[in-house]
Amino acid sequence: MSMVYINIFLAFTLSFMGLLIYRSHLMSSLLCLEGMMLSLFVMMTVTILTNHLTLASMTPIILLVFAACEAALGLSLLVMISNTYGTDYVQNLNLLQC
């Protein structure tokens, strides 16, 4: 395993650990999710380029589109929650209320 793969896997692991540790604020959770998606994008791109997989060359672009949609939805939820409740604490949100 080359150093590039180790660094990308380490970035994914650190983002996942950040998601587990800093889950009190919604903004920090969204940033950790974006870090995970970015490391997955780079890992897929490097793997496809080094193995010359021409049929899977569109897969990283599709992943990037889904990551952009996830970021837009997450930020819109963050704005809605901060306008409604005044904070972005995750523990203050009760998802069973309508």
From Swiss-Prot:
One GO CC term, this protein: respiratory chain complex I
Domain of life the protein comes from: Eukaryota
Any Gene Ontology biological process: ATP synthesis coupled electron transport
Transmembrane segments: 1-21, 30-50, 61-81
Entry keyword Mitochondrion: yes
First-listed, main subcellular location of the protein, grouped into a coarse class: mitochondrion
Protein name listed in UniProt: NADH-ubiquinone oxidoreductase chain 4L
Species for this entry: Gulo gulo (Wolverine)
Name of the gene this protein is made from: MT-ND4L
